[in-house]
Each structure stands twice: as C-alpha cells, then as structure tokens.
Amino acid sequence: MKIWIDADAAPRDVKEVVFRAAKRLDVVTILVANAPVGVPANATTVRSVVVREGADQADRYIVSNGEPGDLAVTADLPLAGLLVDKGLFVIDPRGEEYSPATIASRLSMRNFMDDLRGAGVETGGSAPYGPKDKKAFASTFDRLLTKAIRMAETSSE
C-alpha cells in the first residue's frame, strides 16, 4: 500500500499531514510532480518523482504506477476519476473523498462549469485554502489511510 500525491499543486499543509502519517506508520509515500519537490530529510519512506514536463505527465505516472488499495491525493478531477476506476482511495486537499458513487457527478459538474467559463460566464473560483480545509483533509485522510492499511493487511494474509 502506497500513498501517491499529485504534488504540483498540493498545499504545503497537505504534504505536512501526509509526511507525519507516513513517518508514524512507515508507509511509502511518493510525490509526483513536473519539478523537484522538497522531501523531509528524515522521511525515509517518502520520495519524490520528477516527470518530464508536459500536460498530464504526473497524472499518467500515478495512473500507471498506482495499484488498487493505494491512497491518492489530488485536486485534479479527471485524474481522480481514473484512479477511482482503478480501485484507489482518492481524496482532494480539502478533505473530499472521491468514490465510485460520487466521481461521475463531480466530473459532470466540473465539465458543466468549464462549459460556462468557455461561454464567458464568470463562475468564481475556490476559496483560499485555510485551517478548516486542513482539518477536513486530516480527518478524511486519517480515515481513508486506516481503511487502506487494513485492506492491505487483510489481502496479505
């Protein structure tokens, strides 16, 4: 079981929560980005993978290497959809879990909003990332990580 982070746009707070959990639970964690990403020196289970520049290269790497039961962190809905379809647990930096039951409607809404923006309609943006988001992320991340670890332990018996 591994943790995958789509690191190009992951907030620092999210990475800190994941780094602490990875160290505490000895879980392999891989940050994937188009540019080097800092990894704590004492985090022996955390590593960074730099993919070549280009649209969706980090996404392709995570989809190719992630396995069912792994946990992924991404704000990229199309990537989340691919990972959910592959059997990964997926969470966004604000603590929203994506599942087979929710991903289709989230992708549909995203596409609708893209169409509105393409037609010149101002749709606004996301609120700035704040303490409530970090707390929601930490709570959902802990729950999903526990679930993923239990699933990995059960399948290895």
UniProtKB/Swiss-Prot annotation:
CDD domains: PIN_YqxD-like. It comes from the Bacteria. Signal peptide: none annotated. Transmembrane segments: none annotated. It holds the Pfam family DUF188. PANTHER family: UPF0178 PROTEIN YAII. Belongs to the UPF0178 family. HAMAP family: UPF0178. NCBIfam families: PRK00124.1. This is UPF0178 protein RB974.
